[in-house]
């Protein structure tokens, strides 16, 4: 078998190869064995029609399409490997000439392939520098957030105020009927958190323990339960307890409780400042790299096939599904709660997906032009660093990465990172 690959455009080409006659004959035999299983012919048991009788009744040509499918399936991988290219998607299959038993079959197969980016300027690009200075207000805000995290709830005498926590029973009624999912006992709610529908929490302000009240609200038009959307409702509320936050004092003891490595509040503040600075530097580095990749991509010329964009959208939907799944929600539930659909999400993701594909192709072109190489040793070193970062044994991490391509995928990521490093080394702040 002699296979030849010829590109016809930036993202498409034709593979031509000839499958030998004996391979086609075997495929015809295999097709007969498959087809005859389902044949019901009077005078013969199901699946037992002799081959000569089949040929007489239907003609051997009736097997050729199935045989062609079998032959293609059995030969295409070898032809692709011999021609030395990597297809992304199948576009079309043609056969030159007439199919005939005892003769070779000449395939002409059109594939979509990854296009090559035509690079523009990618060195000497300018980026907007981001300040990494940490202000005193930012340190104070972080300190107060830690203080709030250490707060404890204590029972409070008197009326509910915004920010207090209420423990109460409620039962919801619409059109005079109690509705499903609108009842709870000893429910805990922070007033002002916005967890309940608009107007509910505000009407609880001023209530005291033991008080009962009818809370009148209207469900939003876009509420996920269609039978309640836009309807007025009454919630019968009985308040059991009012709790308020008691925050710890900002002193040396508080500092030691938060961070065992410090002894005083001033040391904690210094530690917070150092952490915030490190975070800002990392964020600034990421922003700079993103800006440079965006510019290099904008300067390049790329013909991105639709199939690549759709594949990237598939990845993005999968990534999003994994994120919401970690919060205990599957995608179908998410679509129901938000009133959206997968089709709408995919359409919204398309533009970003295309930009991601373009950026990847540009970085690949830069890596090729700059002759960037990533060795197995580089990948192993990166694996070691990742195992330390995520506190996972290297072998376990290797197993987890295997379905995504393992070390080869890791090497590809490293190559892209090195390509961005070249943009950074040759870039400059405005």
From Swiss-Prot:
Keywords: Cell cycle, Cell division, Chaperone, Cytoplasm, Isomerase, Rotamase
Gene: tig
Transmembrane stretches, start-end: none
Catalytic activity from the UniProt record: [protein]-peptidylproline (omega=180) = [protein]-peptidylproline (omega=0)
Function summary: Involved in protein export. Acts as a chaperone by maintaining the newly synthesized protein in an open conformation. Functions as a peptidyl-prolyl cis-trans isomerase.
Any single Gene Ontology cellular-component annotation: cytoplasm
Record domain PPIase FKBP-type: where: 163-248
Protein name: Trigger factor
Family recorded in the similarity comment: Belongs to the FKBP-type PPIase family. Tig subfamily.
Gene3D superfamilies attached to this UniProt entry: 3.10.50.40, Trigger factor ribosome-binding domain (3.30.70.1050), Trigger factor, C-terminal domain (1.10.3120.10)
Organism superkingdom: Bacteria
Keyword S-adenosyl-L-methionine: no
GO biological process assignments: 'de novo' cotranslational protein folding; cell division; chaperone-mediated protein folding; protein transport; protein unfolding
HAMAP family tied to this protein: Trigger_factor_Tig
């Amino acid at each position: 078998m002699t296979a030849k690959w010829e590109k016809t455009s930036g993202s498409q080409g034709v593979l031509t190869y000839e499958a030998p006659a004996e391979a086609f004959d075997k495929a015809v035999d295999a097709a007969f064995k498959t087809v005859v299983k389902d044949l019901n012919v009077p005078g013969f048991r199901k699946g037992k029609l002799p081959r000569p009788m089949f040929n007489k009744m239907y003609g051997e040509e009736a097997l050729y399409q199935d045989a062609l499918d079998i032959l293609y399936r059995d030969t295409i991988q070898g032809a692709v490997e011999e021609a030395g290219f990597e297809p992304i998607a199948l576009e079309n299959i043609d056969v030159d000439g007439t199919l005939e038993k005892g003769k070779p079959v000449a395939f002409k197969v059109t594939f979509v392939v990854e296009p090559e980016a035509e690079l523009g300027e990618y060195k000497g690009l300018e980026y907007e520098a981001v300040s990494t200075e940490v202000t005193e207000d930012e340190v104070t805000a972080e300190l107060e957030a830690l203080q709030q995290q250490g707060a404890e709830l204590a029972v409070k005498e008197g009326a509910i105020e915004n920010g207090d926590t209420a423990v109460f029973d409620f039962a919801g009624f619409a059109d005079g009927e109690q509705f499903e999912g609108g009842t709870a006992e000893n429910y805990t709610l922070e007033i002002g958190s916005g967890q309940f529908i608009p107007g509910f929490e505000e009407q609880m302000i001023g209530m005291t323990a033991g008080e009962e009240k009818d809370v009148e609200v209207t469900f939003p038009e876009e509420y996920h339960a269609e039978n309640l959307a836009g309807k007025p409702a009454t919630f019968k509320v009985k308040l059991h307890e009012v709790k308020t936050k008691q925050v710890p004092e900002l002193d040396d003891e508080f500092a030691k409780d938060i961070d065992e490595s410090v002894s005083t509040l001033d040391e904690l503040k210094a530690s917070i400042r150092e952490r915030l600075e490190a975070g800002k530097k990392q964020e600034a580095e990421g922003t700079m790299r993103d800006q440079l990749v965006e510019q290099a991509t904008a300067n390049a010329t790329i013909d991105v096939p639709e199939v690549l964009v759709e594949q990237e959208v598939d990845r993005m939907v999968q990534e999003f599904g994994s994120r919401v799944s970690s919060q205990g929600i599957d995608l179908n539930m998410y679509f129901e709660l938000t009133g959206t659909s997968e089709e709408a999400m995919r359409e919204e993701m398309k533009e970003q997906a295309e930009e991601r594909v373009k950026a990847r192709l540009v970085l690949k072109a830069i890596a090729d032009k700059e002759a960037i190489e990533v060795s197995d040793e580089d990948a192993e070193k990166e694996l070691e660093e990742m195992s330390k970062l995520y506190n996972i044994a290297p072998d376990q991490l290797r197993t987890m990465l295997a379905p995504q391509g393992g070390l080869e995928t890791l090497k590809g990521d490293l190559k892209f990172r090195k390509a961005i490093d070249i943009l950074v080394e040759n870039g400059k702040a405005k």
